[in-house]
C-alpha cells in the first residue's frame, strides 16, 4: 500500500485536493495518506481547511490520518519521517519550506517527490526568483548525491503561476478590493501585459492527477497556468463586470512609476522599497501548460469562470 505524505492540505488548493480524494475514495483503496499539519497550538489562517479535515476523517473508505509537525523545524520532521515509512511526499505548503522537508524525507527513504514550487523562479528580478533558484539548486544537488549512491529517486516539480480563488491569496484578492473601491484606477503602462493566473481548484485537481499517474508524470517539470493568457487590464475589467462597477483607468508611464518608487525608497531611508515590485508590474508572466495537458489532461478554467467564486466570497464578506 503506497503511503503518501501531503503538506499544505489546509490551504485553498490543498482543500480542493482533499475534496478530490474524498470523491475518488473508491479508486484509492490501495493508498494510505498522512496529512502533515501544523500543531494545534499554532493559529491557522485556514479554518475552513481544518473543518474540511474533520469532515474527511469521518470518511471511513479513505485511509487517511493527520499528523502534527512544524515544517520549520528539521528535528520535528526528522522524527516524523523516521516513524512513518512513507513512499511519496507531495509538498504543497511552500517552496520556501522545501529545503526543510526534502532532506529529511530523502534521509528516511522517501524516493518519490512531488514539489509544488512556482513560475516565480523564471523572474529576472533578484528578489522574486533568486531565492527559489537557490532552493531548487540545493535540492537537485542533494538528489544527485543520493542517486550516485544507487537510490532510484523520482522527483517532479510543479510550477503554478499566480494563484487565485481565496480572499487571502494576496494577488487577485487585492485587485478585487481595488477595483471595487477605486473609481479612478491608476495603472502602469495601461496594464497591457499578459498574465495567466490559475484557479486553486484546477491546481488541487492537477495535484491528484500527477500523484495517481506517477508512471507518466515522474521526473518531469510541469507549468500549471490558467486557461489562457489575459492582460491585467482585462482582469480588472472582468472583475468590475462581475462586481457591477465602472472604473476609469489612468495610465502612468513606467519611468514615472519607477521614479516614484525610488523617491519613496530614499525618503524612508530604504525602509519602504517598491522598486522591484514596480518592475515586476510590467514583467510578462504568461506561461503555457502544454506538457501538463498532454500527460494528464490538464484543462484549467478561463479566468472569467474561475474568478466567480472569489467574487461571491468578497460580496458575502461585505454584507
Feature map (PLM): residue ranges:
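A conserved pocket-lining segment of Rossmann-fold NAD(P)-dependent short-chain dehydrogenase/reductase
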Residues: 177-198, 209-210, 216-218, 223
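N-terminal Rossmann NAD(P)H-binding glycine-rich loop of SDR-like oxidoreductase domains
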Residues: 4-27
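Glycine-rich phosphate-binding loop and adjoining beta1-alpha1-beta2 segment
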Residues: 40-58
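Flexible, glycine-rich beta-alpha linker
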Residues: 156-174, 193
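Conserved Rossmann-fold NAD(P)-dependent oxidoreductase catalytic core, especially the SDR/UDP-sugar
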Residues: 88, 99-156
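Mid/C-terminal beta-alpha module of Rossmann-like enzyme folds, strongest
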Residues: 210-273, 289, 295-319
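SDR active-site strand-loop-helix element
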Residues: 7, 36, 92, 113-119, ...
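Conserved Rossmann-fold cofactor-binding substructure of NAD(P)-dependent oxidoreductases
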Residues: 65-86
Amino acid at each position: 500500500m503506497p503511503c503518501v505524505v501531503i503538506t499544505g492540505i489546509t490551504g485553498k488548493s490543498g482543500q480542493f485536493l482533499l475534496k478530490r480524494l474524498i470523491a475518488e475514495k473508491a479508486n484509492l483503496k490501495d493508498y494510505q495518506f498522512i496529512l502533515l499539519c501544523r500543531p494545534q497550538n499554532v493559529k491557522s489562517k485556514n479554518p475552513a481547511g481544518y473543518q474540511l479535515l474533520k469532515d474527511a476523517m469521518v470518511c471511513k473508505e479513505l485511509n487517511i490520518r493527520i499528523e502534527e509537525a512544524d515544517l520549520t523545524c528539521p528535528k520535528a520532521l526528522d522524527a516524523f519521517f523516521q516513524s512513518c515509512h512513507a513512499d511519496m511526499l507531495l509538498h504543497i505548503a511552500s517552496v520556501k519550506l522545501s529545503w526543510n522537508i526534502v532532506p529529511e524525507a530523502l534521509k528516511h527513504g522517501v524516493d518519490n517527490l512531488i514539489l509544488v514550487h512556482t513560475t516565480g523562479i523564471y523572474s529576472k528580478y533578484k528578489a522574486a526568483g533568486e531565492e527559489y533558484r537557490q532552493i531548487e539548486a540545493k535540492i537537485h544537488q542533494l538528489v544527485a548525491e543520493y542517486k550516485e549512491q544507487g537510490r532510484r529517486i523520482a522527483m517532479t516539480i510543479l510550477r503554478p503561476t499566480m494563484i487565485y480563488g481565496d480572499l487571502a491569496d494576496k494577488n487577485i484578492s487585492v485587485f478585487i478590493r481595488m477595483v471595487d473601491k477605486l473609481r479612478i484606477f491608476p495603472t502602469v503602462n495601461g496594464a497591457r501585459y499578459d498574465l495567466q493566473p490559475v484557479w486553486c481548484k484546477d491546481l488541487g485537481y492537477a495535484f491528484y492527477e500527477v500523484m495517481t499517474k506517477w508512471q507518466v508524470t515522474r521526473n518531469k517539470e510541469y507549468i500549471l497556468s490558467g486557461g489562457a493568457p489575459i492582460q491585467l487590464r482585462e482582469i480588472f475589467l472582468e472583475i468590475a463586470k462581475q462586481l457591477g462597477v465602472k472604473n476609469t483607468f489612468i495610465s502612468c508611464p513606467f519611468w514615472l512609476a519607477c521614479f516614484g518608487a525610488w523617491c519613496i525608497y530614499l525618503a524612508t531611508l530604504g525602509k519602504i522599497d517598491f522598486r522591484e515590485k514596480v518592475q515586476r508590474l510590467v514583467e510578462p508572466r504568461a506561461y503555457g501548460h502544454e506538457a501538463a495537458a498532454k500527460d494528464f489532461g490538464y484543462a484549467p478554467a478561463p479566468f472569467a469562470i474561475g474568478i466567480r467564486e472569489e467574487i461571491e466570497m468578497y460580496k458575502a464578506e461585505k454584507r
